[in-house]
């Protein structure tokens, strides 16, 4: 059997950069929707009507995951579908109702919506839980949920997660959850909300779109 030469990791990385070779990132998968719960689920009131005419009419929430050497980091977000702005987010090492609530509470703090808002999500345990639904009810918010196993019913948030991973996460190898948290925070608040141009918004960023339509 032929044996190769011993080569250090840093030298391999340098040679790969010179040759324009990139290592393929292994994409770990983990389920985030727990359908095995006792709580009732809402009907799909949104019904894929993603083009919203005013802010704070429809919010959409969902969760995803990012792998680090320490283990999984979970991300919950709330988007205003009018401008695709991430108005609430939370990260943690457990996939819990509390994570969803923290993202939603941030959204409430930023926006202070009037009663009548529609909140769309999947029908997992975090969003169907009594305490989360009670929180929606306390603010006069109606719940809408995707059909079973149909990610297209929440396509706007799924699209955000896909873009986040393609543009950021799949190019990183996070050692700690704190490292990933800081990176994702900067992506959301510095880049995506303020600078990233969206084709659905006429190639304005969410912040530009909201500022432009507020003046119009």
Where are these regions (language model features)?
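Charged DNA-binding/catalytic regions of mobile-element recombinases
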Residues: 1-216
């Amino acid at each position: 059997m032929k044996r190769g030469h011993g080569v250090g990791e840093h030298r391999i990385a340098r040679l790969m950069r010179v040759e324009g070779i990139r290592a393929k990132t292994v994409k770990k998968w983990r389920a985030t929707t727990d359908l095995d719960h006792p709580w009732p689920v809402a009907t799909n009131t949104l019904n894929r009507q993603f083009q919203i005419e005013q802010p704070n009419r429809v919010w959409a929430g969902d969760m995803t995951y990012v792998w680090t050497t320490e283990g999984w980091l979970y991300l919950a977000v709330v988007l205003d579908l009018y401008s695709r702005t991430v108005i609430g987010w939370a990260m943690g090492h457990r996939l819990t109702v509390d994570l969803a609530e923290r993202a939603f509470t941030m959204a409430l703090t930023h926006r202070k919506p009037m009663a009548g808002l529609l909140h769309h999500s999947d029908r997992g345990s975090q969003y169907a839980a009594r305490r989360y639904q009670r929180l929606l009810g306390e603010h006069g918010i109606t719940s809408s949920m995707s059909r079973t196993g149909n990610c297209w019913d929440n396509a706007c948030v799924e699209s955000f997660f896909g873009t986040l991973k393609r543009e950021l996460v799949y190019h990183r190898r996070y050692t700690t959850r704190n490292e990933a948290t800081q990176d994702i925070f900067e992506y959301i608040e510095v880049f995506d909300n303020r600078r990233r141009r969206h084709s659905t918004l006429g190639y304005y960023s969410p912040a530009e779109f909201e500022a432009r339509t507020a003046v119009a």
